[in-house]
Amino acid sequence: MKLDESKIIDIECDHIRTLEAKKITYRGLEIYAVKRSIYTSDTERAFLHKSGINTAWWCGYVEAVQDMQDSFGGRRCFEDNVIKLSCGNKTKEYILANVHGGYTYAFYGIPLVLNDGQRLFLGWDYNHWPDTEDCVTYQEILKEGMKVVDSMQEFQTT
């Protein structure tokens, strides 16, 4: 991953470490799958794994169509996991399955819509809590990201 792309995936919290990051381009938009951890050292993570404690989780970021920036309403509240798109008199809502915000959305106000100044991104945590590390795979993150891209492009053409 190029250095300038790191600001997209590191935008959330400075105490969260990126362990692995992968990117694909789908229908002209980028989808990132990122494995994160709150533990700072590999030694610490290895010790906790031996104790049966998972220490990381996958999350995803999807590039949004830039001219749709004004269409994203974000989450109404962090529990309901709904992205609302509005364009003129059209409104569409869709739910990201199995997404939850965790404490970061509640206390730090992390936005669902991320903007690095040039590109717009939607971001979500699938399994924010470390004890659910193995619940969601890299492939599932990409599959969900593709659904988001499909939904945005479908909305633009209706």
Give residue spans per PLM region.
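Short, internal acidic amphipathic alpha-helical interface segments
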Residues: 61-120
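Amphipathic, interaction-prone secondary-structure segments
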Residues: 14-87
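Charged, compositionally biased non-catalytic regions
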Residues: 1-16
